[in-house]
Swiss-Prot record:
Function text: Catalyzes the synthesis of the hydroxymethylpyrimidine phosphate (HMP-P) moiety of thiamine from aminoimidazole ribotide (AIR) in a radical S-adenosyl-L-methionine (SAM)-dependent reaction.
Co-factor: note: Binds 1 [4Fe-4S] cluster per subunit. The cluster is coordinated with 3 cysteines and an exchangeable S-adenosyl-L-methionine.
Top enzyme category: lyase
Record protein name field: Phosphomethylpyrimidine synthase
One Gene Ontology cellular component: cytosol
Length: 639
C-alpha cells in the first residue's frame, strides 16, 4: 500500500490527467435512441480536406467505438471520490423486479463496513445494494427469452451498428473485402431485435450487474465486434488502490472493453469498490482469489459457505462477471501429471489442491445450481474458467484441457436452464495449427456460448514479447469465432504490468480484434482502414496519426525522423525521403497521365489500375517516327 494512500483516498483523490485528455482532433458525441436517456457515446475524428494537388475534396469525420466512458468528455466533471454518473438506474427501477436492501447480505462486507480502521481507505459514497425480488430473475437473458427488448439491448444495437451507418455515408470508403466468418451469422444490420435474439439463445452475453448502474452496456458474442479484456489488480508484492484505479482509466482510454480485477493483495474489498464506482465498462473478478485470502491462503480450508459469502459480497458491489473454475474435476487432476507445465491457472491449482486434500469433488461443481441462484438475483454473468488450460504449447489440446471443456459445456446447459448468461474461458498456449480445433470444439461442446481466450500464445520462446506471441494467436482465434480476447502484456510470466505495459497490451489486442473483424467481414469494419490509407496517400500526416489506434506513438515516431512542423505537411514520408516515396511517385504518374491525355481507371480492391489511352495512337506513333528521323536515324546514340 502506498505511503500516501490515506491522504489520497479520504481527501484528495484525483483522476490521472493522462486518462482524461481528449484524443487529438476528436470529439465525444452521443447518439440518442428511442428514449432520451439512451445516449450512446462514440468518438468522432475530424479530418482535414484533401489537398488541391490530390483533387481537393472534403473528408467526412470518422466515428469509432469508444470505451473511455465520461473520462474523455470535457463536459463531464470527473471526481473519483463520488464515482461516475448513473446510466442505468432508471431502466433497472422501471422493470420493477428488484428491491433495495436495508443492509448488506454478506457477513464479510458488513464486517469491513463496520471496521473503523478502514475508514481512510473506504469509498465514501457507497450505493445501496439491490437484489431481485423473491422468485424473480433479473438477467438480460431472462428478459430476452420473454421477448423483451431492454434499453441495454437498444443501446448495444446503436453502438455495434455504428460502422454500418457510416458506410452508407462514406462513399468510396465503404469498399470492403468479403470476409470468411466460419459459420458465424453476422447480419447486414444489427438491430435491437437481433441483440435480443442472440442473448436469448446464449450466443451472446450482456455483462451488466444491477448494482453497476454506471455501466455503459456492451455485448460479447461471435456475431458482434470482437472485444478485448484488460487485467489489473494488486498483489502481495505491491500496488495501491490509487495505482489500480489509474490502470482502470488508462486501460479503458486505449480500448479495453472489460476490465478484470485480479487483486490478491491487501484490501481487496475496498480496492474493488473504488474500481467499480469509477468503471464505465463491465468488471470481472475471480472470487476464489478473495475467498483464499479469507482462509490465509490455505486452499484446503476453503468451504462452500466462505465462497458463497464472497459471491454475494462481490455481487452486491456490482461485479458484472465471475470466473468460476467449476470444471476442474477430481478425475481430471491426474491427467495433468505428465504435462510439461502442469496446472498453470491459479484458480485451477487452488481447486485441484482442494479436491486432492479432501478427495472430494470440486465444491464449485457440486454447488453449481446454488451459484446460479445467486447469479440470476443480481444478473452476474458466468465466465466458466479453464483451470486446466495448457501453460505451454507442449501441453496444448490434451486430454485434461478438452475433458474440462466438455464439462464446461454441461455446466453451460445448466446455467441456461436458470437463464444465467454464460461465456467460456479458453487457452492459453496453443501453436497456430492447433488453434482452430480449440474454437471448433468449444462451439460444438458449449452450444456457441461466447468464447473468451487468453491469447493463445503461439510459441514459448519470447519472454518479454508475449504480447506479440499471443497477439498472433488472438487474431487467429478471433477470426475463427472467439468473442473476447484477454490481453497479454510484455510483462507476462515476468512481473506485474505498469501503465505502459497495460497500454502496449491493449493496443496489441485492439489490432488483433480489429484484424479478426476485418477477416470475418463485419459490416463497415474497413472504414477506418480506408480513411487512414487515403490520408497516407494524400500525405495528410495529422489525419494518419489521429486515425490510428495510438496517435501519440505514431506522432512521436514521425518526430524522431522529421521533427519540424513543416514535415507534417510534406509530400513525402519519413522512411524513403522526397525522391523515393512510392506514393509521391504514384501521384506523379497520375499527374503525367492526366497531362498527356491518359486516364487511370481505378479497379476493385486487389485489382490493378487500368490505363486507358485517350489520344490518337497513329498520330503518336508518327510523332516518334519524326523524332527518330530528326536525330539522324541512328539506332544507337551516345549518351
Amino acid at each position: 500500500m502506498a505511503a500516501n494512500e490515506k491522504t489520497y483516498l479520504s481527501e484528495t483523490a484525483k483522476v490521472d490527467q493522462s486518462s482524461v485528455q481528449p484524443f487529438p482532433n476528436s470529439s465525444k458525441i452521443y447518439v440518442e435512441g428511442s428514449r432520451s436517456d439512451i445516449r450512446v457515446p462514440m468518438r468522432e475524428i475530424s479530418l482535414a480536406d484533401t489537398p488541391t494537388d490530390f483533387g481537393g475534396e472534403q473528408n467526412r469525420p470518422v466515428r469509432v467505438y469508444d470505451t473511455s466512458g465520461p473520462y474523455t468528455d470535457p463536459e463531464v466533471q470527473i471526481d473519483l471520490r463520488t464515482g461516475l454518473p448513473d446510466v442505468r438506474s432508471r431502466w433497472i427501477n422501471e422493470r420493477g423486479d428488484t428491491e433495495a436492501l436495508a443492509e448488506k447480505s454478506s457477513l464479510f462486507a458488513t464486517q469491513r463496513l463496520n471496521d473503523p480502521a478502514l475508514a481512510s481507505l473506504r469509498f465514501q459514497h457507497l450505493r445501496t445494494p439491490r437484489r431481485a425480488k423473491s422468485g424473480a430473475n433479473v438477467s438480460q437473458m431472462h428478459y430476452a427469452r420473454q421477448g423483451i427488448i431492454t434499453p441495454e439491448m437498444e443501446y448495444i444495437a446503436i453502438r455495434e451498428n455504428m460502422s454500418l451507418q457510416q458506410a452508407r455515408e462514406q462513399g468510396v470508403l465503404q469498399e470492403q473485402h468479403a470476409g470468411q466468418a466460419f459459420g458465424a451469422a453476422i447480419p447486414d444490420e444489427i438491430t435491437p431485435e437481433f441483440v435480443r435474439s442472440e442473448v436469448a439463445r446464449g450466443r451472446a452475453i450482456i455483462p451488466a450487474n444491477i448494482n453497476h448502474p454506471e455501466l455503459e452496456p456492451m455485448i460479447i458474442g461471435r456475431n458482434f465486434l470482437v472485444k478485448i479484456n484488460g487485467n489489473i489488480g494488486n498483489s502481495a508484492l505491491g500496488s495501491s488502490i490509487e495505482e489500480e484505479v489509474a490502470k482502470l482509466t488508462w486501460g479503458t482510454r486505449w480500448g479495453a472493453d472489460t476490465i478484470m480485477d485480479l487483486s490478491t493483495g491487501k484490501n481487496i474489498h475496498e480496492t474493488r469498490e473504488w474500481i467499480i464506482r469509477n468503471a464505465s465498462v463491465p468488471i470481472g473478478t475471480v472470487p476464489i482469489y478473495q475467498a483464499l485470502e479469507k482462509v490465509d491462503g490455505i486452499a484446503e480450508d476453503l468451504t462452500w459457505d466462505i465462497f458463497r459469502d464472497t459471491l454475494i459480497e462481490q455481487a452486491e458491489q456490482g461485479v458484472d462477471y465471475f470466473t468460476i473454475h467449476a470444471g476442474v474435476l477430481l478425475r481430471y487432476v491426474p491427467l495433468t501429471a505428465k504435462r510439461v507445465t502442469g496446472i498453470v491457472s491459479r484458480g485451477g491449482s487452488i481447486m485441484a489442491k482442494w479436491c486432492l486434500a479432501h478427495h472430494q469433488e470440486n465444491f464449485l461443481y457440486t454447488h453449481f445450481e446454488d451459484i446460479c441462484e445467486i447469479m440470476k438475483a443480481y444478473d452476474v454473468s458466468f465466465s466458466l474458467g479453464d483451470g486446466l488450460r495448457p501453460g505451454s504449447i507442449a501441453d496444448a489440446n490434451d486430454e485434461a484441457q478438452f475433458g474440462e471443456l466438455e464439462t464446461l459445456g454441461e455446466l453451460t446447459k445448466i446455467a441456461w436452464q436458470h437463464d444465467v448468461q454464460t461465456m467460456i474461458e479458453g487457452p492459453g498456449h496453443v501453436p497456430m495449427q492447433m488453434i482452430k480445433e480449440n474454437m471448433d470444439k468449444q462451439l460444438r461442446e458449449c452450444g456457441e456460448a461466447p468464447f473468451y481466450t487468453l491469447g493463445p500464445l503461439t510459441t514459448d520462446i519470447a519472454p518479454g514479447y508475449d504480447h506479440i506471441t499471443s497477439g498472433i494467436g488472438a487474431a487467429m482465434i478471433g477470426w475463427y469465432g472467439c468473442a473476447m480476447l484477454c490481453y497479454v502484456t510484455p510483462k507476462e510470466h515476468l512481473g506485474l504490468p505498469n501503465k505502459d505495459d497495460v497500454k502496449e497490451g491493449i493496443i496489441t489486442y485492439k489490432i488483433a480484434a480489429h484484424a479478426a473483424d476485418l477477416a470475418k467481414g463485419h459490416p463497415g469494419a474497413q472504414i477506418r482502414d480506408n480513411a487512414l490509407s487515403k490520408a497516407r496517400f494524400e500525405f495528410r500526416w495529422e489525419d494518419q496519426f489521429n486515425l490510428g489506434l495510438d496517435p501519440d506513438t505514431a506522432r512521436a515516431y514521425h518526430d524522431e525522423t522529421l521533427p519540424k512542423e513543416s514535415a507534417k505537411v510534406a509530400h513525402f514520408c519519413s522512411m524513403c525521403g522526397p525522391k523515393f516515396c512510392s506514393m509521391k511517385i504514384t501521384q506523379e504518374v497520375r499527374d503525367y497521365a492526366a497531362e498527356h491525355g491518359t486516364e487511370i481507371t481505378p479497379r476493385a480492391p486487389g485489382e490493378a489500375e487500368e490505363v486507358v489511352r485517350m489520344v490518337d495512337v497513329e498520330a503518336e506513333m508518327q510523332k516518334k517516327s519524326d523524332e527518330f528521323r530528326a536525330q539522324g536515324s541512328e539506332i544507337y546514340s551516345k549518351v
